[in-house]
Amino acid sequence: MYTAVAFQVASTINIKLSKQQLAHQLLFQDSDELFYQVAPEKFMYLFHYGIVSFFNMNPDETAQLIKEIEPYCVEMIPADMSEAISVHIVENTLKVDFEKVVLPEVNPEMIRLVMLNVSQSVALDAYS
């Protein structure tokens, strides 16, 4: 089992500067978001609206990466607002439940979509 977790860490994250400075493998980008592979089966997703999400990382790893992106954040916010979802890998299975997602494999694009959804959940909580 894996976990995807998202945090509201700032009012905004400078995506352009983050892209220029972060050394991780960039897998996806657009004007408002950056999706990185940090290590095998470990991913980080940054959003302009101050959300960062992580896949398959322990609290020490997430804390280190939050420190790494801090220079590109405007108005840091304590990472109290968060959302997490369990991700299970079961061959030939694709299923979404309330607190769990089942995927057929650790596929970066599928993981990105799970992380996008958990991040949007935090954003909705933050702005509601």
Name each model-derived stretch.
Residues M1-E109, L113:
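Short Lys/Arg-enriched alpha/beta "domain-start" segment
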Residues E109-S128:
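Structured inter-helical modules in multipass membrane proteins
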